[in-house]
Amino acid sequence: MLSAAVLCVQAASACTVPAGFTRLVSPEAEIAYRWEPERLEVGQFFAAEVIACRAPGPEAVREVVLDAQMPAHGHGMNYRPTATQQASDRFRITGLMLHMAGRWRLTFDLVQGDRRTRLSRDVDLKP
């Protein structure tokens, strides 16, 4: 089952990141995020607060998509998260759950027109 959270956001540029956020940077884009609660546990719902800091090109970022997959198992999350916009470059995603221990790949897609820029982070979830 493919789960994704989608939210429309406006153009983002390099930003000041509040304490407690982690930056995720590629040559093309940058976001900052934090988990709530901070420590992820197997089978526990959590939320993500995300700031879209920078994306390529002149077009505004119109969507941010958050998803999680287990590459070794070929599946994703069992629940469909919900995104809520908090500001033009900031949003909160709830209803996230990593239901198994192991390596998860979390992807954050910034969508501008026909262009999609992906940032990803692997998380090793212990039992």
Question: Language-model segments: what does each one mean?
Answer:
Residues 13-105, 109-127:
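Contiguous segments within soluble domain cores/interaction surfaces
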Residues 1-10:
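Bacterial N-terminal signal peptides
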